Amino acid sequence: MVNLTIDGQKVSVPQGTTIMQAAATVGIEIPRLCYLKGINEISACKVCVVEIQGQNRVVTACTTPVQEGLVVYTNSPKARSIRRTNVELILSQHDCMCATCVRSGNCSLQTLANDLGIYDIPYERDVVDTPWNQEFPLIRDSKKCIKCMRCVQICDKVQKLHIWDVQNTGARTTVDVAGNVSIEDSDCSLCGQCITHCPVGALKERNDVPKIYDVLADPNKVTVVQVAPAVRTAWAEAFNLPPELATEGRMVATLKKIGFDYVFDTCYAADVTIMEEASELLEHLQKPQDHSWPMFTSCCPGWVSYVNKTHPYFVPNLSTTKSPQQIFGALAKSYFAQKKGLKPKEICSISIMPCVSKKREAALFSMRSSGTHDVDIVLTTREFIRLLRAEHINPAMLDEQPFDNPLGQSTGAGVIFGASGGVMEAALRTAYHVIEGKEAPEDAFTDVRGTEGRKVREFTLGGATLRTCTVSGLGNAGKLLDELKAGKVHYDFVEVMACPGGCVGGGGQPIHDGEERADVLGNKLYAIDSNRPMRQSHNNPDVQELYEDFLEKPLSEKAEQLLHSDHVKEHNYM
């Protein structure tokens, strides 16, 4: 162990520990901007400078290892003065129009400047503005970029897509799309992890909230909104609601208060997804020679985009079942429209998702089974929160309301879609029922849960062994695809979520700088699942009615027309 003193406190830590890590063990949080543990430890911002007794120069706490006998001052006049100067220099190259920034109030730079008492910038302003396609689902504002390199590192080290890179040199150094290509022509999957790991407002999703106001004001439109499973785990954070108030019913009430005509649950569509995908898996198992192996899930649009752009060889392996968002949209403009005597074009189908890639998915050519876009507008969880704030709605004051029918009732299986391993578990619950003729034990498939990069398990269905694999994060997915193509591994059924931890850790979720919360939010979904009276998709009476009255059976001709896609043209927009 190495012994040192930090701000007068004796500290004993293992060799190799940095000063920043050592300080944290005794509750001393050293200010920083660029630091991401294990991902971005490059001291780019120079905000974490500290003074060491006996040394003339300050050092960066995030990269300097501890030494025996060091006496460290994290906030001495010298360290504080240099830290202040460094932040002032960053601000001189940053668009400080905080009032019009989506990260205002949740910006690490803004907080740091306030903490340091910086109210004027003594240096000449030098803010670089480069053009960007404002219609693209992911927006980059070069005026706000502080060159912390977090986006570069999260994309390189975690997702391994290498979309961002350093451009130019010297004073003109900036971050932009790598390879001298546009973002549209890059391999970007729109996972949004660069957004959630940006400490400022340099990266954000396209703002589609104004479209909501337009459609709510249109008397000729019936507004139908669906809410994804993961959204219910995080929407209430911004309003500091305790768990007993942050309920599904209160979430529904807020949407009704805004003025949406019908509020439905994407978990219902997830149940339908399972009916189709589980049937598809069983068909593959019955005729293995007719299909490509393994069969991949296809509910994550970031994953589907990734396969199309980087590993097209595996496109035939994707389940043809659409994502719950798109299945809901197709049913809203066909089944629901028929029940209500409406034409598809009279319905505006809106989704609230934890995901940026859903915006791209909704615009694809292949997602127009009704003759119009099946989903017209997609909001992220963050946009939903901004919409509530703009409407001055206090959710705590609203009485709970149920989801509307017939697209509102769901099972626990639909809920767990939002967590890594959830789609796999939900599909296996139904596949087991079909093969064995009885319900699986409650904990039969819970071992597929978790946020590990790759989790391999074997289950017995109908006397045969099913080898499954759940993958979290595109970096892990790429490694898996390489091994599959080389013949190093073999699986029968593979679930992939583009975002580490699944949709609960999605690129459209609320941002908590420096925190990874997928585990915590995923457990919320599993808690909801365990308390549901129905936990298997095939037991949803509304789904049973859908098949009896409209679709006939899973994989029927009508189901194939409305609920399936070959995914071949997933990169083509409307």
For each predicted feature, which ranges?
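Structural motif corresponding to the C-terminal cap of alpha-helices
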Residues: 159, 198, 336-340
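Short strand-turn-strand beta-turns centered on an Asx-Gly dipeptide
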Residues: 6-9, 53-54
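Fe-S ferredoxin-like electron-transfer domains
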Residues: 46-190, 196, 203-218, 222
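Residue-level recognition of alpha-helix initiation/capping sites
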Residues: 14, 136, 146, 189, ...
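A short N-terminal beta-strand-loop micro-motif at the entrance of redox/enzyme domains
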Residues: 9-15
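Short structural boundary motif marking the start of a folded domain
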Residues: 1-4
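Iron-sulfur-associated redox domains of electron-transfer enzymes in respiratory
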Residues: 15-75, 79, 206-574
